[in-house]
Amino acid sequence: MASKNNIFDIIVVGAGPGGSFAAKASAENGYKTLLIDKELISEKGRYKACGGAIAWELVEEINYPEEKIARVIESLELHHVDGEHYSKKGKGAVIWRSVFDKYLTDNAIESGAIFKEKEPLISIHKSNDTYQITTSKSTYKAKYVIAADGVTSQTLKYLKWPYFRSEDLILTITKEMKTSKSYIDKFLGLDTVHLFFGIELIPIGYAWLFPKTETITMGWGNQINLVKNSREEFDKFASLSFVKEALKDSEMTIYKPHLIPVGLRPKLYEDNVFAVGDAGGIVDPISGKGIPYAMMSGQLAIESIKTCEKRDKLDKLGVIYERNLDKKFLKILKAKRIARDGIFQNDENLKKFLKLWETYRSSQIVMRNLI
């Protein structure tokens, strides 16, 4: 049984960007809020496989301290394997997810959310309009649950929600390569991230080199049902002459495979449970960018609860949540998912997209039917 102290209005499972932002919004709106994570975060944060590039607008929006930024970025270099090259200007930041996520979790705690870490979920079930969540350490109850525990969400697995289609999943491999700051500055540039494309290299996806302070985050991602041998395919990227030169004399400190959704989960809401961020597949299908959409979806879940309670329309909660998502950004992500198949159909289409991407945002390319 959950003690009185363990009864909440809203329980958020997963303290990534989506979960922490939802917990912050929940606490700020006066809800008794519990944020749970299976990992230990309070000391140094926890490692997440992620390139870690975010837009400067997001840095400013959340007042992210500049001393926590691993590298400020001013441009994006797009390499096609046949030698063609494209450049895109735009200010951004490369961050370590351990540091970034901890900052957001700390913000949620400061706003009044209760945080429980190192508590993996063991079970979840509903009884009399209340969800009972059991972790490795305790049992908690709440009316609403925010599933923010990633693409392989245990919350939604226990609730028997349908999983993603294989064509909506990207398998990524990330290697953290330790090197010197001076070599990164000299070879990759002081303020540049590098992306690599080519249907022969990666049928539906891309690879990347994201410089941090003294580390290059090297990554590769391909649609999972097209992957035959991930190590061989990753090594094909690693053997490109530019990549070999960038990583010479570097030392691997982390190797991590990871899944990224690039299409929506078949449902995003059911019976007072919300899927946010990667758990719902709320990710840019072309770039794989997920951090801002996770944060916005977490906040919109809370706003939807507040609106429906105020108007006494809790029966419309799922409709309101998806309508809010559509208005903010989901309509564009859905259009991008359709466009993605055409972009990666052949190298001609891919290059046309890369050329347009130099000048336009990917959302403009898709919504204006430029491709």
What is each PLM-predicted segment?
Residues 2-18:
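Beta1/beta-strand and adjacent pyrophosphate-binding region of the FAD-binding site
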Residues 11, 15, 27-48:
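Glycine-rich FAD pyrophosphate-binding loop
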Residues 18, 41, 152:
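Conserved Rossmann-like nucleotide-cofactor binding loop
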Residues 40-76:
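N-terminal FAD cofactor-binding segment of flavoenzymes
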Residues 77, 81-96, 132, 212-224:
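Helix-loop-beta segment of a Rossmann-like dinucleotide-binding subdomain
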Residues 306-371:
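C-terminal helical "tail/cap" subdomain of flavin- and related membrane-associated enzymes
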